[in-house]
Amino acid sequence: MSLRFIYGRAGSGKSQYCLNSIKNRIEEDIDRPLILLVPEQFSFQAEKNLIEVLDEKTGFKTQVLSFKRMAYRVFNEVGGITAKHMNESGKSMLLYNIIEDNKNNLKVFKKAAKRQGFITTISDIITEFKRYNITPEIILNNLENIEGDNLKYKMEDLALIFSQFETRLHKNYIDNEDDLTILVEKLNKSKQFDNAEIWIDEFSSFSPQEYSVLEKLLLKSYRINITLCTDYLNQGRFVDTTDVFSPIKNTENKLLQIIEDNNIKLDKPIALKCDPCARFKNSAELQHLEKNMFSFPYKEYKNETKDICMLKTLNQFTEIENTAKDIIKLCIDKGCRFKDIAVITGDLEGYENIISSVFLQYNIPFFIDKKREINNNPIIVLILSALEVLSKNWTYESVFRYLKTGLLDINNEEMDILENYVLANGIKGYQWTNDKPWEHKSFSNYELEDQALKELLAKINDIRYKAMEPIVTLNKNFKSIDKAKEFCEVLYEFLCNINLPDKIQNMIEDFKVEGEIEKASEYNQIWNIVMEVLDQIVEVIGEEKISLKEFFKILQTGFSEYEIGLIPPTLDQVMVGSITRLRSHNINTLYIVGVNDGIFPSPLKEEGILSDDDREFLGDKGLEIAKDTKSIAFEEQFLVYSTLTTPSKYLRLSYPIADGEGKTLRPSIIISRIKKIFANICEENDIVKLNGEEEELKNISSAKPTFNYLISNLRKDVEGVKIDNIWGDTYKWYLENEFWIEKLNRLIKGFDYTNQSKYIETKKIRNLYGKPLKISVSRVEKFSQCPFAYFVQYGLKAKDRKIFNLSYPDLGIFMHSILEKFSHELEKKGLEWGTMDLNWAEEEIDKLINEELDNKSLDILNSSKRYEYVTKSVKKILKRSIWLIGEHIKRGNFKPSYYELSFDIDGDYPPIAMELHSGEVINLIGRVDRVDLLQKDGATYLKIIDYKSGIKEFKLSDVYYGLQLQLLIYLDAILTELAERSGINGEPGALLYLKLDDPIVKNTVDMSDEEIEKSIIKNLKMKGLILNDPNVIRDMDNIISGISDIIPVMVKKDGGVSEGRSSVATKEEFETLRKYVRYTIIEICEEMLEGNIEIKPYKKKDGSSCDYCIYSSVCKFDTNIRGNKYNILIDKKDEEVWDAIKKKLEYKNI
C-alpha cells in the first residue's frame, strides 16, 4: 500500500511516463493487475496511446478504466446491483412529478418551480449533493445550525425534494451518481484490485465520492501512481489561491490527508523536470510561453515569433475565414495533417454555424465535438406539437408546427393551401374538430368563380380531415384514461398509426445513401430515445394519475435532458470544440478563436440556487459542497494554462473586434499578457486591407472560396478598377478546368445582369390597367413613389397572404364608416355638431358600432378578448373625435355640408376627367371625408377635411414631387363642379388633416376639466393649408389669438397672418397649385400608360418608399446592381417649392 506522485509542468511527459512504466512492468513479467485510470472523456485516447506503446499481444494485460467503467467491472464481479439505472431524463421527469405534488409545501421555490429550467437546476444541485456525500438526513440534521430564514427555508425545500426523490428512486432504480457510492461498498468484496498497480492520469481534482473510491483502492492496491500537473509538490502546506497550480495542490493535500488517516506509505515522488519539455522540444517559443504565462516576474522573449501568432479581425466570419486559409496553407506548405489540428473556442454555440459554413466552403474535413440537443429534431417536434395541439386547443402555431414536421402524409402544396385558408379565416379551437365542413369564403385576396370556389373549398376540407384525423383519434383515446402508463400506451399507438417507425427507417436509409452519416446516426438514436423516455415514465410514475397537460410537461422535461453524441465519421479531420472539452494532447496545431473579454477566460457563472454566501456559510458549518463562483474563477487560470500549453508546434490566437451585429468586442486579457511576454509576436489583422501580390496570394486556397474571390476581382476589372496580375493566372486555371468553366462563363455573363425593365409594351400595359383608364388619386401617388411597386400591385395584382387580423387600413375604414353614419344620423334628426347633446352622441356611437359588429362587417372585433379591448379603444377614439369636431365647428362659421363625398360614375360627383396630350381622357375616382362650406361676401368657401387614424403632415415639397395630390385635386374638382353645375363662385378655404385619436394627457392631477380639454384640442391640432385671409381664418377659429390650437395658423397683434409661423396660401397660390396638380397627374398617367415600370423608389432624408414596401423580394432593389438608383427627393423650403412650381408651369405654358 503506497502512493506515489508523478509531477511536472505541462508537456513534461507525465502521461508518457505512465505508459512507459506500464510497458516496463509487463516486460518485467510482474504478476499483478495493471490499471490505467483516466477521466471518462479521455478513455478512448488513453487506449489508443497505450496500444501505440505496447504491442498487440501485451496490450490486453492492462485495463484502461474510468471511475464509471470501474464501477461496472466491480458490479459484474461481486453482484449486488438489482436495480435499473435511471438516466438524466427519467430523473428530471421524476423531479417534475415530485415538485408538482409538493408545490404547495415549498416555502422558497413555489414560484420558481414554474420557471423553465428549474427542474434542471434542482437536478444539478441533487447531483452535487450526491457527489459530495450529502444525504437528506445530513441536511435536516444541520438545519438548526443555519442562521437566516432564507437559507434555512431553501435547505428545507431542498431536503424535502431530495428526500422524496431518493425514496421514490430507490424503489426500483439507482441513478448515475449512486454508482460510486455503491462502488465504495462493493470494493471491499472485490478482488480485481488486490495488489494492483494503478496509474491515475489527466485528473486535476476529484469529487468527495471519487476520493472515497481512491481511499479504498489505496488500501487494496500495491501502489497508486497519480500524475499532478504542477511545478513542485505542496507537501501539505497552505495553498495560495492565486497560484495557477492551486487546484492541483489542493488535490495533493487531500490525498496526503487520506494516506495520513490510513497510515499509508508515501513513496518518493517522480519529478519530471525538463528544459525543453518533450512536448515543446521543437518549439522554444511554446516552451517559453509555458514557463512564463503565469510567472511573476516573467521573462521577455525578444525574437520574432513563428510558432505563436495572433490575428485581429473585423468580425467572426472573417476570423474563421482567415483560420481556414491558414489551415489550408499549413497543410500544403508544411505537410500538416487535419487530424493534428484543433480549433477551439469559449463560445462554441456562437461559432459552430460559421465554422461549418466556412470549412465546408474551403473543403476542410471537420468534426464538431459537442452533444446535440434533440428538441429541434422533427420526431420530437411532432410528438410534442401533437400533444400541444390538444393541450392548447388547436392553436394555429401548434397545428402547423405538427403538420410541418415532414413526417405526415401531407405534401407541401396541400399544406400551403390549408395554411392560407386557416390564416385568412382565423381558424382555431373547435372550428377544427366540429363536424361541419368549412364554408368561409375568405381564403384569398383573389376573386374566384363559384364553381372554382366550391372545388377549392372541397379540397381544403379533404386536406383538413386528413390532417386532423390522427389527432382527433388521439384526443378521443386520451379522454378515457388518467394514468401515466396509459398515456404512454396511447401515444405509442398514435405514432404507429401514422407509420412513424417505418418513416424513420426509410429516412435513415435515405441519409446513408446521400452520405449524411451524422443525420442517419441522429435519427437512429432519436427513436430509441423516445422509447426510452416512454419506458421511464411507465417505470417511474406509471400508476400515478395525471392530466394531459401534465403528461405534455413531463415529456417535454424528459426530452429536454437528452443530448446525442455523434462519432467522428473519419480519422483525418480537424477537431472543433469547446475549450472545456479539449481532450487530446496529440495536437500539433491549435487555433483558439474568439479570444475576447467574457469568452476566454469565461465570465463568472451565475451563482444558482445556493449563492456564494450560502456555500461559504454551509462550508463553515461542515457541509462541504462545490466551490463558489470566485474559487472557480481562480481555477479558470489553470484551464487557460492547460489550453495554451496543449499544442506542440503551432498556436494561433484570434479575436474579432465586433460580433455579427456590429457590437464592439474587446480582446481578452490573455492577448495583452502574451504580447508583453512576446514583444515581437507574429501579429496579423484583416481590418486594414493591404495591396500587393503577397496579400492577394492569401486569398488563393481551396477552389471554391478562391473562385468567389476571382469573381469579385473580375467584377472590379469590368468596372474599371485595376486588379493584381495574379487574378489573370487564376482565371486561366479555372478556364482550363472542366468542372469550373461552365460556372465561370455563366457568372461572367451575370456581370451584365440588371433587374431593371424600364418599359413594357403599351398594348400589354393597356390590358393590365384597362381602357379608358379609371384610377384613384391615391394610386397616382403610389406611382410617384415607385413605378415598379405600382405595376406589381395594380398591374400584376400581387397581394400579400391574407391573414385574419386587424390592419390599420381596416380599422381606418371602419372608423370612417361609423363617422359617416353618425353624420347622416345628425342630419336626419336635424341636429347640429355645435349644439348636439354629448350623452346622446356617445350612446349613438356605441349603438352604431354594436350594429356593425352584429352585422359582422368587421367580424374580427368579436373574435377575442384582445379585440374586445380594441373595440373599446375605437369607441373611445370616436367619442373623442365627435366631441372634437363639435368643438371645431363651435369655434367657426363653416358648416359641414358633405360627408364621404364621392367622385365616381354612381357617386355624388362624376369622375374627375383629365385629358392627356394624346387626347385620351382618364377618369379619377375618390372620396372626400367631409366638406364644410362658408357663405361670405357672395362667395362660397370650401374647407376640405380628411380624417386620418395616424399622423399626416401637409408638405408643399411632397405636392411638388407628386406624393401628396388628393386634397388639392378634390378641391379643384369641387370648385369646378360648383361653377359649372350650379354657377356658384367657389373659393378655397382650407385643406386639412384631422387625426382620429384619444390622446393621453400627462400630469392631470392639478388640471381642471377645462384645462384637460384644451390640452386635448391642442394635441389634435389639424395640419394642412389655409387660405391667407384673416377674415376667413376667423371664420374657422373665432377665438384665435396668436397661435391657433385647432388650425396651423398664427395671427399677429395687428390681426395679420404671420406667414413664417403659418401654413397658408393666397387665392392666387391656390390657383397655381390647382393647375400644377392637374399638370402633374397628367404627366404621371402618361408615364404609366407608356409602360414605365422602372424600379425607382424615392428616397428622402426621413426614409424611402422601400421602408414598408411588401414587394422588395420581387424587385430585389440593390444599389450595387447596375441601373438600381434611388429617386432622390430633396426636401425643399416652401419658397423654393413656389418658385419651382411657377417655373415649371411657365415652361409648359400653363
UniProtKB/Swiss-Prot annotation:
[4Fe-4S] cluster binds at C786, C1106, C1109, C1115. The gene is addB. HAMAP family: AddB_type1. Heterodimer of AddA and AddB. Its cofactor is Mg(2+); [4Fe-4S] cluster. Belongs to the helicase family. AddB/RexB type 1 subfamily. It comes from Clostridium botulinum (strain Okra / Type B1). NCBIfam families: addB_Gpos. GO terms for molecular function: 4 iron, 4 sulfur cluster binding; 5'-3' exonuclease activity; ATP binding; double-stranded DNA binding; helicase activity; metal ion binding. This is ATP-dependent helicase/deoxyribonuclease subunit B. Keywords: 4Fe-4S, ATP-binding, DNA damage, DNA repair, DNA-binding, Exonuclease, Helicase, Hydrolase, Iron, Iron-sulfur, Metal-binding, Nuclease, Nucleotide-binding. Despite having conserved helicase domains, this subunit does not have helicase activity. ATP binds at G8, R9, A10, G11, S12, G13, K14, S15. The heterodimer acts as both an ATP-dependent DNA helicase and an ATP-dependent, dual-direction single-stranded exonuclease. Recognizes the chi site generating a DNA molecule suitable for the initiation of homologous recombination. The AddB subunit has 5' -> 3' nuclease activity but not helicase activity. Pfam families: ADDB_N (PF21445), PDDEXK_1 (PF12705). Gene3D superfamilies: 3.90.320.10, 6.10.140.1030, P-loop containing nucleotide triphosphate hydrolases. Binds 1 [4Fe-4S] cluster. GO terms for biological process: double-strand break repair via homologous recombination. Its EC number is 3.1.-.-.
